[in-house]
Amino acid sequence: IDPKLLESLA
């Protein structure tokens, strides 16, 4: 999973 993508959800 792309960690940068997860930060976008935050």
Curated annotation (Swiss-Prot):
Keyword Secreted among record annotations: yes
Localization: Secreted
Gene Ontology BP term (one): venom-mediated perturbation of biological process
Tissues of expression: Expressed by the venom gland.
This protein's name: U1-myrmicitoxin-Mr1a
UniProt GO MF annotations: toxin activity
Sequence positions bearing Alanine amide: A10
Main location as per UniProt: secreted
Note: Negative results: does not show antimicrobial activity.
Coiled-coil ranges (or none): none
Gene Ontology CC entries for this record: extracellular region
Transmembrane residue ranges: none
Keyword list, A-Z: Amidation, Antimicrobial, Secreted, Toxin
The protein's role, per its UniProt record: Insecticidal toxin that reduces the survival of aphids (A.pisum). In addition, it increases the sensitivity of the aphids to two commonly used chemical insecticides (imidacloprid and methomyl). Does not display any antibacterial or antifungal activity.
